[in-house]
Amino acid sequence: MTKKPIVVGVTGGSGSGKTSVTKAICDHFSGHSILMIAQDVYYHDQANISFEDRLKVNYDHPLAFDTDLLISHIAALRRYETIEKPIYDYAKYTRKKEVEIQEPREVIILEGILILEDKRLRDLMDIKVYVDTDDDIRFIRRLLRDMKERGRTMDSVIEQYLSVVKPMHNEFIEPTKKFADIIIPEGGENHVAIDLMTTKIESILQKHV
């Protein structure tokens, strides 16, 4: 690898369209080697507590994440070092014993709801993107996803949204918008904003020699 890796942070609330924006970046830079890192797999290892206690954890709070490990891994990738990325078991709410070996790439995309909350992590990013989507749309997307993909009931999704997701979004996620270099309204449907973002990434790539 002859160029210094570029780190792109993509954040926004749950259901904002972060995945669509990330896919747009991957499609645009398909000629480059790309590595996607999801903040979700850096939830703390909870093997030492019961399953019942794991269900009580607030997974939308900054303290739910092993941010120190994530920071060390992003820093290592920027130094062209290999990392052992955790594998998270969403059914058991803890990490698996296995890890995934990841090599550094030209473009590293870091995606997650709270990646801009910690200054140490922000400082490792070359460009920071906030996907800004209407609260009602985000809630509907989360409702449909959790019922279809995670077997949740409508009542449980609504209760969690009102008691945890929405308050945490307002307290921790929304305020990080001010740290973004680019704000993309309406997520992956905003092609003009995505074009602006990819142009900015291209200019940074050209300088990273």
UniProtKB/Swiss-Prot annotation:
GO terms for molecular function: ATP binding; cytidine kinase activity; uridine kinase activity. One of its GO terms (biological process) is CTP salvage. InterPro entries: P-loop_NTPase, PRK/URK, Uridine_kinase, Uridine_kinase-like. Keywords: ATP-binding, Cytoplasm, Kinase, Nucleotide-binding, Transferase. Pathway: Pyrimidine metabolism; CTP biosynthesis via salvage pathway; CTP from cytidine: step 1/3; Pyrimidine metabolism; UMP biosynthesis via salvage pathway; UMP from uridine: step 1/1. ATP binds at G12, G13, S14, G15, S16, G17, K18, T19. It catalyses: uridine + ATP = UMP + ADP + H(+); cytidine + ATP = CMP + ADP + H(+). GO terms for cellular component: cytoplasm. Its EC number is 2.7.1.48. It holds the Pfam family PRK. HAMAP family: Uridine_kinase. This is Uridine kinase. It comes from Listeria monocytogenes serotype 4a (strain HCC23).
